[in-house]
From Swiss-Prot:
<keyword id="KW-0997">Cell inner membrane</keyword>
<feature type="transmembrane region" description="Helical">
    <location>
        <begin position="44"/>
        <end position="64"/>
    </location>
</feature>
<keyword id="KW-0573">Peptidoglycan synthesis</keyword>
<feature type="transmembrane region" description="Helical">
    <location>
        <begin position="185"/>
        <end position="205"/>
    </location>
</feature>
<dbReference type="GO" id="GO:0009252">
    <property type="term" value="P:peptidoglycan biosynthetic process"/>
</dbReference>
<feature type="transmembrane region" description="Helical">
    <location>
        <begin position="214"/>
        <end position="234"/>
    </location>
</feature>
<comment type="similarity">
    <text>Belongs to the UppP family.</text>
</comment>
<dbReference type="GO" id="GO:0046677">
    <property type="term" value="P:response to antibiotic"/>
</dbReference>
<keyword id="KW-0812">Transmembrane</keyword>
<feature type="transmembrane region" description="Helical">
    <location>
        <begin position="21"/>
        <end position="39"/>
    </location>
</feature>
<keyword id="KW-1133">Transmembrane helix</keyword>
<feature type="transmembrane region" description="Helical">
    <location>
        <begin position="247"/>
        <end position="267"/>
    </location>
</feature>
<keyword id="KW-0961">Cell wall biogenesis/degradation</keyword>
<keyword id="KW-0378">Hydrolase</keyword>
<dbReference type="GO" id="GO:0008360">
    <property type="term" value="P:regulation of cell shape"/>
</dbReference>
<feature type="transmembrane region" description="Helical">
    <location>
        <begin position="85"/>
        <end position="105"/>
    </location>
</feature>
<dbReference type="Pfam" id="PF02673">
    <property type="entry name" value="BacA"/>
</dbReference>
């Protein structure tokens, strides 16, 4: 058993868990962390997607009471049926775009310039959204969302296929701009993450199954466990944070991180691959 590899897997798991549900892009951070650790080959890229399962399990645990109540009410209550329908509608655009353009996006957009640009642009969008969104709020609970609202959030989620955008950032900020409260947008983003990230993980593992062996299992399990633990802590913290704070600090972080990516790429401090 390669202890160094397991340590790298644990670090990558922590990075995934801490960044998946904050509006700061887990993909961008995983690219940078992988480059710094020398953990960036084809198998590592599959690993990065697979350990999202740990983060998703954390969300399921945090929201388990709501999920269980919805599942129990699904056969008979319209509110539960509406939520399930809205999640299906929100999930569909990412599935379609991923199947059509996933390989092309991975081949051409995973570059430092793209990652840095989307970090900076995303930060500026958050600053703008936080100024505009509160005045436009019309939806305060998931029960008040309509199918068109869910579809629009699902379309915005597609932007997250560009590395550095942030899936949670796109859906939360997009939801706020569409009229959802910060809490409702965050809740829908986290619920929408469950089918989206599970689907992406299963599809990636299936597509790259030839790269994987039984010997890789300890590495994947280590990453998954650390992803789960760090995501559980992060989601619980974020839900408390948004009750009385805005996303403005994350905007400044994104801008600073984007500038750092440009510097490390141009100086060669981090071996980014163009």
């Amino acid at each position: 058993m390669d202890v160094v590899l397991l340590v790298k897997a644990a670090i990558m798991g922590v990075v995934e868990g801490l960044t998946e549900f904050l509006p700061i892009s887990s993909t961008g951070h995983l690219i940078l962390a992988g480059a710094l650790l020398g953990f960036d080959d084809a198998k590592a890229q599959v690993f990065d997607v697979a350990i999202q399962t740990g983060a998703i399990l954390a969300v399921i645990l945090v929201y388990w009471a709501k999920i269980r109540a919805t599942l129990h009410a699904l056969p008979s209550e319209r509110q539960a049926q509406r939520l399930a329908f809205n999640l299906a509608i929100g999930f569909f655009p990412a599935v379609l775009l991923g199947l059509l353009f996933g390989k092309a996006i991975k081949a051409h957009l995973f570059t430092p310039v793209v990652v840095a640009s989307t970090f900076i642009i995303g930060g500026l969008v958050i600053l703008w959204a936080e100024r505009r969104a509160p005045a436009a709020t019309r939806i305060h609970t998931l029960d008040a969302m309509t199918a068109p609202d869910a579809l629009k959030v699902g379309l915005v989620q597609c932007l997250a296929m560009v590395p550095g955008t942030s899936r949670s950032g796109a859906t939360i900020i997009g939801g706020m701009l569409l009229g959802l409260s910060r809490q409702a947008a965050t809740d829908f983003s986290f619920f929408l993450a469950i089918p989206t990230l599970i689907g992406a993980g299963v599809y990636s593992l299936y597509q790259e199954r030839a790269l994987l062996t039984v010997a890789d299992l300890p590495m994947f399990l280590t990453g998954l466990v650390f992803s789960f633990l760090s995501a559980w802590l992060c989601v619980r913290w974020l839900l408390r944070y948004i009750a009385s704070h805005s996303f403005v600090p994350f905007a400044y972080y994104r801008i600073g991180f984007g500038l750092m990516v440009l510097v490390t790429a141009s100086t060669g401090w981090v071996p980014w691959v163009d």
